[in-house]
Amino acid sequence: VRTEDGKELDKDGTPTFKAFPEGKVDWYTDAGFLRYSANCLACHGPDGLGSTYAPSLVDALKTLSYGDFLSTVAGGKKNVSASQDLVMPALGTNKNVMCYIDAIYVYLRARADGAVGRGRPENQDPKPAAYSKAEDECMG
């Protein structure tokens, strides 16, 4: 794991979390919780555990690659069966999601790996300057 502009990256360059003792986390994990709660919770349920009409993202992130996660969020997904028609809208143009997609992924990855429990994690790190700059550029 390496840190680049305040963001933790795994050996493949995929954003990842940094857990500290006593349940505290890095900025991205905490920000991801907030953005997930604002944009994803209504369908995928509290803490990423799923609902009657959207899957558990905690379970999905155990096997879903970063690229597949980005593709699904940006392009949407449709699963049709004899009993139900499940549709996730494409969110690729939603700045409230896409400007924070790495933070959302990091939070869900920490949940999937069991590093973060239910509820809001305690923040440890200050907001990285690079995060603020990227946020300002993305949101316009």
Task: Show where each model-derived region lies.
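Sequence context surrounding c-type heme c attachment/ligation sites in exported
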Residues: 30-41, 50-51, 64-68, 121-123
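Short alpha-helix boundary/capping motifs
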Residues: 64-72, 85, 116, 132-136
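Electrostatic cytochrome c docking/interface patches
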Residues: 1-35
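Short charge-dense sequence patches
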Residues: 16-26, 50-61
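Axial heme c-ligation environment in periplasmic c-type cytochrome domains
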Residues: 51-58, 76-103, 108-129
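Solvent-exposed, acidic/flexible segments
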Residues: 25, 29, 33, 62, ...
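Short, low-complexity, Pro/Ser/Thr/Gly-rich segments in the mature regions of secreted, periplasmic
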Residues: 125-140
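The canonical Cys-X-X-Cys-His
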Residues: 36-46, 69, 73, 88, ...
